[in-house]
Amino acid sequence: MSEIPEKVRKRVASLRDELDYHNHRYYVLDDPEIPDAAYDALMRELQDLEAKYPELVTPDSPTQRVGGAPLKAFEEARHLLPMLSLDNAFEEADVLAFEKRIRDRLGEESEIEFAVEPKLDGLAISLLYEDGHLVRGATRGDGATGEDVTANVRTIRAIPLRLQGRGWPKLLEVRGEVYMDRAGFEAFNREAASRGEKVFVNPRNAAAGSLRQLDSRITAKRPLTFFAYGAGHVEGGELPDTHAAVLDALAEWGQRVCPERDVVTGAAGCLEYYRRIGERRDGLPYDIDGVVYKVNRFELQQRLGFVSRAPRWAIAHKYPAQEQMTLLRDVEFQVGRTGALTPVARLEPVFVGGVTVSNATLHNMDEVERKDVRIGDTVIVRRAGDVIPEVAAVVLSRRPHNARHVVMPTHCPVCGSEIVRSEGEAVARCSGGLYCAAQRREAIKHFASRRAMDIEGLGDKLVEQLVDAGLVDHVDGLYRLTAEQLAGLERMGEKSAHNLVDALEKSKHTQLARFIFALGIREVGEATARALAIHFGGLDALMAADEEALMQVPDVGPVVAHHVATFFQQPHNREVIDALREAGVHWEESEPAALQAEDLPLSGNTYVLTGALESMTREEAGDRLMALGAKVSGSVSKKTTAVIAGEAAGSKLAKAEKLGVPVLSEAEFLELIGE
């Protein structure tokens, strides 16, 4: 017998302690601290060491048992047959070796038939039916003894309280998985967050926490569901002789079984099924972490038997982990095309979801604070399919004493403009909309759009080319373009280039309302832009207005007033506006309506325009109404003064008639405005 190195003994002892700790958190507290992949890695390391040094194997090793002892808060429920876990396969070679072990043990020359199904990420339970009636529901617990959760199980509508059909045994144990599907999980978390309550990290935690509530009324409010995956103890009757046929029978008796189940032949069939489900994994309505292969014929299962903690006739083939632990090195802030700031975690590179991840989104500062993410933390990173990797949770037990809080910058990391965050909003934004390089593409596209400066021929793709070629940095750069520069772009001939230069020249003569809208100020749509233009009469007066003055404008509240004032306070934005004026952009200014707003004839009235007018556009009609002190709304309500209906008026007219709101014809509208 070879001497066992002391460091091996210490490592084995350390692994057992760590696995026992995580067993307790996972099986007993239902509050796992590390992802399944990290636990699996620890277990495999211990298995490998015990295989190499069998003298170190002890009866209490985590490799020799299923889990930990159940909590005492529920009554104990002893299983009539042990509920064992499954061994795992991570690579194709593991599946081939699994099949070879089976064939060697059975002495089979022909290929083995396997029942295959997705491995749901939920909570395993046992349902006991006596004379067709549900009499007990129990968690797996340590495999021999679980917890009696009958009252909670009865609240899950996917679980029948009475079996259907006929032919079921007098005593039948159904085994399956309680889980929360993705839609239910997301809806539950949204509602919990809106109430300021705790949200769950993932559907598995949500299912486990919900099923183990001491008050079944709480469980009843949670969107739990169930899939049966097999039968356990049976008395007073017989079941079919294959696993697949048993699932079919359970379905006939009213149990919910997974529609993705199948029967395949040999390891090749198993691997093809693994690939097929893997391709559809992200589109399934529930989370899975692998697929399960079971020898289909029970007679062969009985011949194969069990090892200490798992059956020889089944294995779980895991997909690349969608969650992993790693170190959060730093947090940086990215500026999106609309100016939104997103905190991004810079990570110690980790392999997760099939790729190496070194960056992950933290979404916004509300999420950072809710999860209490700090620089230096060990975090759980999640990546599913093509979804951007995210920091799902913090492993608080591994937080170092020098972990640093994440601090939101006060100025844009791209352009230096002030960062603003409106009350009640999760997202902070850069206020340098016209100047910020991160926002330039969207700013130029909006500026050129039909309802803004209406630059004919300047579409989104051409804007992309102009920015990529370095010809335009900010919107004022559009008016410095030459036909020669434009002709050199892809799909831009000499004629098209001259046409665009002419369109740019034509757009210089505009309306103040259009120009204000073209600036892309947050929350300022066409109607608000018109209201601002009418109220102040000129751009200089608008730029000089403080928030209090802005709130005197019809339909402008504190949020919009703050956005407008902040926009014009930024030196970079003012520089771009000055450059546009120097380039020749101009409009006709008027006397500010603010001087006599309360005395205007339509002050206090609200109108809605619908259909096509013959005498003017709806936009022009709205300007006339606002010039007379009225508000123009896009929707009809009981507070609407009247609806002005042109030709082909639509649903707004119908709603006005339903609410009893007066309807004016075009002739009545012209009379109203004095024309």
Swiss-Prot record:
Domain BRCT: 597-675
Gene Ontology MF term list: DNA binding; DNA ligase (NAD+) activity; metal ion binding
Record field: catalytic activity: NAD(+) + (deoxyribonucleotide)n-3'-hydroxyl + 5'-phospho-(deoxyribonucleotide)m = (deoxyribonucleotide)n+m + AMP + beta-nicotinamide D-nucleotide
UniProt keywords, alphabetically: DNA damage, DNA repair, DNA replication, Ligase, Magnesium, Manganese, Metal-binding, NAD, Zinc
Enzyme Commission no: 6.5.1.2
Record bears the keyword Lipid metabolism: no
Keyword Transmembrane helix part of the UniProt annotation: no
CDD domains named in the record: BRCT_DNA_ligase_like, LIGANc
InterPro entries in the cross-refs: BRCT_dom (IPR001357), BRCT_dom_sf (IPR036420), DisA/LigA_HHH (IPR041663), DNA_ligase (IPR001679), DNA_ligase_AS (IPR018239), DNA_ligase_CS (IPR033136), DNAligase_adenylation (IPR013839), DNAligase_N (IPR013840)
Location of the active site: K119
Binding of Zn(2+), residues: C412, C415, C430, C436
Tree of life domain: Bacteria
Database matches in PROSITE patterns: BRCT, DNA_LIGASE_N1, DNA_LIGASE_N2
Cofactors demanded by this protein: Mg(2+); Mn(2+)
Protein's job: DNA ligase that catalyzes the formation of phosphodiester linkages between 5'-phosphoryl and 3'-hydroxyl groups in double-stranded DNA using NAD as a coenzyme and as the energy source for the reaction. It is essential for DNA replication and repair of damaged DNA.
Family (UniProt): Belongs to the NAD-dependent DNA ligase family. LigA subfamily.
Protein name: DNA ligase
Protein encoded by which gene: ligA
